């Protein structure tokens, strides 16, 4: 039975109404760093330092001052949104009773580990300080694996509100509450009404949007409240909020199509209440993951969540007996009550159960929840330590739990707020109240900053007709803009004497008919650079003019790190005679680059000395990989000496969804049998999280090779024929097969 006496929460001391007191005297306008430093040195309580409108480049602003509760000291923009801080810049501040507002950090990066820091040194922190109405947008180092924090909160009794944090592209937490000294514990911070805008998939651990604490201090109390924030497709990794300390309240936030979960990774006495998770059927969208002791999860709403395993709609994990702080404390004395789950895929109980995580939940409860739709309950261990009572499940659904669930009709309608809602009668049964977002997107973020995205789709721009000839493709690329379409002549002949560099989304294609032939005098035909994305259709790439080098390729990614995810779409192309020397690849993904999607469709590859897709350059075994979604469908591969695909995700990290690979309806003939071929496979997959191979034939080819790692990978190979081809090789039997025929 739940020990209610343990479910207490430390009070949050709200001093923030003090900031409504307005000071307008003693304002000093500063126009450069020298003037700023002089103003800081002499500012008094009640003073204002005003940054002049314009661009401030390569500035490290250090703001040390002490106001009083009735005489705050302000640092602000002359006009909110008109002070643009860029280049190698950052802002740090310490003292007390400070207000910072109206600044925009855009298209730069920090020279240190933090963009906005609530301290100026280890011992000098900010207390009773408010940061409001600021923006950080694309303030990311180009070095994708380099980690930094956009906002680091130290000290106590600080307020971070109505800010917009958008487009973080490199590793590191967007907003982190730091607790590395006593001066920053039991901090009573308030984080509210912020807009956490889209964050691309990082492809590794270290992409959290909000983290409170770390494993080192997870049993210390932070007493931080995060409320009324809007998380908009913050897809960096699967821990959108990573709670890693005790006594925190995560209440009335909205998670819109976020790939990941609100995760109680470490710490106890967490209050998770009144949050809305809107998955809308998008891939990998998750809800709440419960770990540790005395957690309270109540009155949350979950709709259209598709995540599985550790990323389900509601996940209760197994723990480690006598766990060290950096692992998984068992779920004890916790409550999951009065929540609504609609049209979501999975509820996972005892998730992560293995030899180490062998402790199931105990003295916990799961009561008065409404679960409607085709939700699957997965049980991975004994759940007798959870008291199930008063839950409602629609009549068509089922659960392996024997008691505590009553059947009810699937009574769901779209209410006046545009949300799927159970009937009022069902809501009244659990005392949920009206289904309504606690905060809207428009109510969050900096008041002056648009939330409109600048996404450019393929073929959304103008058409550029490209005549046959030497370097005409290069000229067209130089004159193109994002979304443009380069249309080549049917049957034309094109020669490249320089690298074709792609710096924005572009389509190179020919209309239906004879394919134009593209050859190159350079070792690489096309380089996808940072910001680029490429679509090719109805083309013929031929290696006859390529130089006599090992390691040539048709398409590759930048040799330096790219912090903007790219995509590659290949449809109905022909690739021939990549054989002037060894290891001539069609596509090579270099380290430090990442694709949201790669698709190879309805194409033909003949006489290739390298691999078709080489994506094995992330070899540090830290859970880093090269592509999130890979699709190979409807292709013919003949006389390819290496693999059709080699894809590597090393290490044991569980923080990502991908790689996700679909291979269907392909034909392989004499593939993977080159005398210098290193893996000895026609397809090689290491650490892939989800792999489906179907309706594909092999003839006189090397086998498929699998290396399955942790993270509960799902691998299915079905309806395939392997003639004169070796049997599937794997390091363990954690994969499934169906209708695999060997001849």
What is the role of each PLM region?
Residues 1-27:
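Bacterial Sec-dependent N-terminal signal peptides
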Residues 45-53, 57-84, 91-102, 124-129, ...:
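Beta-solenoid repeat scaffold
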Residues 60-61, 87-93, 106-128, 136-404, ...:
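Glycine- and acidic/polar-rich repeat regions and solenoidal domains
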Residues 401-469, 479, 723, 729-743:
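Surface beta-loop-beta hairpin patches that serve as ligand-binding interfaces in beta-rich domains
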Residues 24-58, 62, 454-495, 524-525:
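Acidic Gly/Asp/Thr-rich repetitive segments characteristic of extracellular carbohydrate-active
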Residues 31, 52, 76, 86, ...:
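Residue-level detector of conserved, well-ordered beta-strand and adjacent loop positions
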